[in-house]
Amino acid sequence: MFDEEFSMRRKPQAVTEVICSGTTHIHYENIANRKESTYMAQNIPELYGSLVFNDKVMRSKLPKDMYKALKKTIENGTHLELDVANSVAVAMKEWATENGATHYTHWFQPMTNVTAEKHDSFISPTGDGQVIMDFSGKELVKGEPDASSFPSGGLRATFEARGYTAWDPTSPAFIKDGTLYIPTAFCSYSGEALDKKTPLLRSMQTLDKEATNLLHIIGNKDVKHVNTTVGPEQEYFLVDKELYKQRKDLVFCGRTLIGAPAPKGQEMEDHYFGALKPRVAAYMHDLDVELWKLGIPAKTKHNEVAPAQHELAPVFDTTNVAVDHNQLTMEIMKKVADKHGLVCLLHEKPFEGINGSGKHNNWSMSTDTGVNLLDPGKTPAENTQFLVFLVAVIKAV
């Protein structure tokens, strides 16, 4: 099955080189010089979220009444009227085309462990053989991709092809690679969830309702909503692309299947929080920039325990937004690594004998008044609230 370069004679050397490749092929030209770094630091607020249809953009692009109606839908889940959807669609299209987008896609998360997207252009033919750029509220709110080729978890027969994508207005649209990405849920004609986001959104709604009722019972009447929050810490390995190509198991499986261990592993634990190698630092710098453009709050970066292992940790966010951000993060990590002559491995256990890659979620609940319900308080009343919710979580888990 494997070719000669993946023979038993080659394996020990290849595994050693792959794991210990963090110091090879240093490309100093990828590291921004002092002047460029200073400029970047001064302009991060301007850069951050520059490719996101966020609240700032909505406020500037939408009429005041339409903006208020959309915010009401986002915050309270009220029905979105067609005239509001049309107004939002026009504003989205104008903003997207101003930023170079020519297409839009309903971006969803089927039960395949990867995201899915179908790109449609904004063009609409006119009677004189020309085209105009058009985008309607109906196209924004609902799509109809062929669902027959996506797994359904046994919910329905394979010939039942109809599936719908429904806009999730609580997760901001964004631009990537010249396309306007619209986060959506994916469900069947009769409402069965065909993705991983629909159950998440439904669980968030249920928890919001029940947690708010519980807070009212124990005397906290000011709370109107309870959101769940997540801050997924993404661990990963970086290996040299040329060494990666020598290992067919890495290429096909994303992990090693056979081979000898590296001569040095994590015994001394000197890699954890160690100084970043120039090539890795350059990669992390470019990754931060790409993530910040998409409004992903990448906060912390450091070496992990295993050789060639690293971690990126964002600031926590509302759960469905954080999940969307994590899907984007994993995709962008691989793309940026390729530009640096590296390969980013996201498998949970790519190498035997050293640490695998976990993803701490840092799940919690917070009220619309800014209180973390899993944060112990300083008074008996606050501690009572904390203990009630802590016990409820332990009971549920």
PLM feature spans:
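Acidic, Ala/Val/Gly-enriched low-complexity intrinsically disordered segments
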Residues: 3-5, 14-18, 29-32
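Basic polycationic patches enriched in arginine
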Residues: 9-10, 34
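Short, Lys/Arg-enriched N-terminal segments with co-localized hydrophobic residues
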Residues: 20-39
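Short, intrinsically disordered, charge-balanced linker/junction segments flanking boundaries
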Residues: 35, 155-158, 396-397
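N-terminal-biased segments
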Residues: 37-55, 81, 277-297
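N-terminal flexible segment immediately upstream of the FAD-binding catalytic core
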Residues: 37-65, 179-180, 303-312
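Active-site core of metal-dependent hydrolases
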Residues: 45-160
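Glycine-rich, acidic/polar active-site loops that bind/position phosphate-bearing ligands
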Residues: 161-346, 354-397
